Every structure is written in structure tokens, then in C-alpha cells.
Amino acid sequence: MANTPLIVSFGEMLIDFVPDTSGVSLAESTGFLKAPGGAPANVACAITKLGGKSAFIGKFGDDEFGHMLVNILKKNGVNSEGVCFDTNARTALAFVTLKKDGEREFMFYRNPSADMLLKESELNKDLIKKAKIFHYGSISLISEPCRTAHMAAMKTAKDAGVLLSYDPNVRLPLWPSTEAAIEGIKSIWNEADIIKVSDDEVTFLTRGDAEKDDVVLSLMHDKLKLLIVTDGEKGCRYYTKKFKGRVPGYAVKAVDTTGAGDSFVGAFLVSLGKDGSILDDEGKLKEALAFANACGAVCTTQKGAIPALPTPADAQKLMKSKSK
């Protein structure tokens, strides 16, 4: 692992409470299963499961859930030198409704939760400087002091020549308003080297038809090396300054879509960490995205995010069985 490039993931990790029966509302559910969640943490775990090297930077409540989550990171091989604890705030919780098609709705308990209270002075900047890729979302932009810490972490990475990877991961209930969400998510848009958005997020951010190239291309900026749009089981689209195209997905029986996007991102970042030239080589890029599509698909076949994250063998098995 000595020569394996480090990918640092920044943001939130929380407990998801998932109904033990899918297709029922939170009120109707008779029981809940607790599962670790939070997109940046899922990405960090996806990376190590696929043989990469990752670290997580974030803040937890000094409570049983917080220590449980950090132990899960450690058990998954994620470097936890960037985590800290808050004695005065709780670890965030989310109640997740699983609809019949495996899609989700969220109800959050975090006012404020420890992850929102991360201060710039608590950042492990040395860890960020060691990374090849620095990955983050937008939830850490919602409130202070975490927003300032997030901006400082990005600047540290950029100044050190680290690639910036952004998955906005829109969670509208956490923002004060729709307008605040769009403004906040776009406030750091032009800093990223790589951005991954879902088709729904394209529609949300542009108010346009996500299927149309000109709508997607309105999200490109001068410094952006790659824009990826995920289209669920249909696969994904990619846009660079030189080329654009689509990579088909893998049809599987989806049980729970939680973590599928994070599994996709983790898989792509592992490929990019190994070979930066994939941003300029369309053939290599398509291979990396096909592998990422397979990882995302495998993740939907089991409940929970981190427990469902695939190994390379899981993804390759699916790719072989569905080779077109």
C-alpha cells in the first residue's frame, strides 16, 4: 500500500435508521435497523474495499454512536487521523424511508450535530497535503463553523496540487430553502476538477431537462476536467473539454439504492488515483466508468451503504455476467 495514492474524504458521517420492512412510511414501521451513513464516509469505505487507500476528515459526537462510527471507519481500513470528537454535540441521525423500488426519503436529526461544528483549527491539514485526490460534498457547506473549515480544507488541497472531487449529494431537507441549496452548492462549483451529479441533481441545479447535452454543459466551467452525470441503472454520461459520451449501466434487482452513488464515486476515484491519464484518454475513461457503474449496481442489491459496498471481484463478476 506504500505507493497507493491517498484519497482524503471530507464531511459528514452519521447513523441511518432504516425501517426493517421496505415500502412502509416511518410512522408505519415497527422496527429500525441502524446503519452507518454519510456520503463522504461511504466513499472513503468504498475506496478501501476496492483496494485503494483513504482517509476521512470529520467531527463526531463524543457519544456511543460517534465512537461506533469511527470504529467502523477503522475496521474498513480508513485512516482516521483526521477525525475529532465534540463533547457538547451529538452524532447526527437520519431516518430513511425505503420505498418499494429501493429509492429513499430522509428525515434528519442534527440541530446542530457534531459534524456541523468542525472548526478550521481542528483540520488535519498535513493529511490533506498528502492526498492525490480530495473529495467532498455540499452538506458541510450548510452552516458555520463547518463551512469555513470546508473552504479552508479545499484551499489547502488546491495549494498542494491535490485534485478536487465534488459530489454535491443534494439533501434538500437540510438546507434552509431551495434557493439556499442551489446557491450554496454552486458557491464552490468553479473550484472542482471533477464533479459527479445525478440526473435529478442536474434538473434541480439548472431547472432544465437533464437528458439534454446543452443543459448539462451549462454546468461545465473552465477548470473542470470531468463532469459525470449518473442516470441510475441506465449508467452514466461523461463530459470533458475534448469528448463526451455515455457508458451503459447494469440492470440488477435493486433492494436499496443507499450508497450506490458513493460506491460509484469511490470506484472511479480509485481508478483515477492509479492513473491520472484517464481524464485525457476516452477509452480508459469509459473502462473506469463501466467499472464504477458495476460497483454502483452491486451496491443496490443489498441493504445499507457500507455493508453493501462491493469488492473488485463482486464488480467484475457482474461485468462478466452482463458483458454486452
Swiss-Prot record:
GO terms for cellular component: cytosol. Transmembrane segments: none annotated. Coiled coil: none annotated. Disulfide bonds: none annotated. It is an enzyme of class 2 (transferase). Keywords: ATP-binding, Carbohydrate metabolism, Kinase, Nucleotide-binding, Transferase. PROSITE patterns: PFKB_KINASES_1, PFKB_KINASES_2. Belongs to the carbohydrate kinase PfkB family. This is Probable fructokinase-5.
